[in-house]
From Swiss-Prot:
Main location per the UniProt record: other
Subcellular location: Endosome
Keyword S-adenosyl-L-methionine: no
GO process annotations (BP): intracellular protein transport
Alphabetically ordered keywords of this record: Endosome
GO CC annotation: endosome
Top-level taxonomic group: Eukaryota
Subunit structure, interactors included: Component of the commander complex that is essential for endosomal recycling of transmembrane cargos; the commander complex is composed of the CCC subcomplex and the retriever subcomplex. Component of the heterotrimeric retriever complex consisting of vps26c, vps29 and vps35l; within the complex interacts with vps35l. Interacts with snx17 (via C-terminus); the interaction is direct and associates snx17 with the retriever complex. Interacts with snx31; the interaction is direct.
Organism: Dictyostelium discoideum (Social amoeba)
Protein name as catalogued: Vacuolar protein sorting-associated protein 26C
Family: Belongs to the VPS26 family.
One Pfam family this sequence matches: Vps26
Record's function text: Component of the commander complex that is essential for endosomal recycling of transmembrane cargos; the commander complex is composed of the CCC subcomplex and the retriever subcomplex. Component of the retriever complex, which is a heterotrimeric complex related to retromer cargo-selective complex (CSC) and essential for retromer-independent retrieval and recycling of numerous cargos such as integrin alpha-5/beta-1 (ITGA5:ITGB1). The recruitment of the retriever complex to the endosomal membrane involves CCC and WASH complexes.
Amino acid sequence: MNNVLDLKLKKIDKIYRPGSKVSGNVVINSKDDMSHSGVTIVVEGTVQLQLSSKSVGLFEAFYNSLKPITLMHYTISVTNGGGKFQAGITELPFEFTLEPLPNQQLYDTYHGVFVNIQYSIKCDVKRGILSKDLSKTIEFIVEVPSQNKEVLMKSTPESLITFNITPDSLVNFKKISKADVPTFKISGGLVSAICNINEAFQGHMIIESADTVIKSVELQLVRVETCGCADGYAREVTEIQNIQIADGDIWRNFKIPLYMVFPRLFTCISTAGKTFKIEFEVNLVIMLEDGHLITENFPIKLIR
């Protein structure tokens, strides 16, 4: 059996908030006595930005603003210098406070396409010249509470949204000639455009009338990632998930519930930094049998 290095956090879900204590153990499992030159832990939080292939080369001014942003970085010495671990399992405790670097702030953990916010703990066990160093890295999750005023906004009547979709209300219809557009009327409502990320997106829709057969109804969650600076920016919209709400020709005047859970890691609270921004939108997509596609867009704000 080779020497095995592992990192174990005391919280099983590995979810922490700014200012909280992060504690755990460095676990070393060795077959024989093992000499070392020291055990260190490096805690790091970074924002990684990148441009899409269509934007590369168009925005030379972006490259300086696209450098990784270090939110937190500190090194912890787990042992006082070198020594020897006895054969078997050795556990070394560690603890640190989750705090950002000066003039920085912590953001939600987020795995996007052009923006990534990650927090990691890396442990290194230094050994002699003739022995191989041991290294182990794990990721932990940071959840940042929203400001109180944002939470209060969620319960105000102004946050309720009603909508009516007709051929005249559509901005971008999939066919140029409106004479070819079938007659339809779709109404509904959303509980709120300000959504708690730990709760489901909810609402309803009603097909009041439609001259053509409806094929299906889908609810699409998209991310809107913006990277750049004052000299210019690149805005990229990509799909996170697509949920089918109804299949086939729906009864007219039947109330259809809209319900969607926000996936962890692939969503975060709506976030804005100096050189990046993360926003979210929901698309209600109605596919007609004749090939038309009706889409209504709802920008939403995610809070915690």
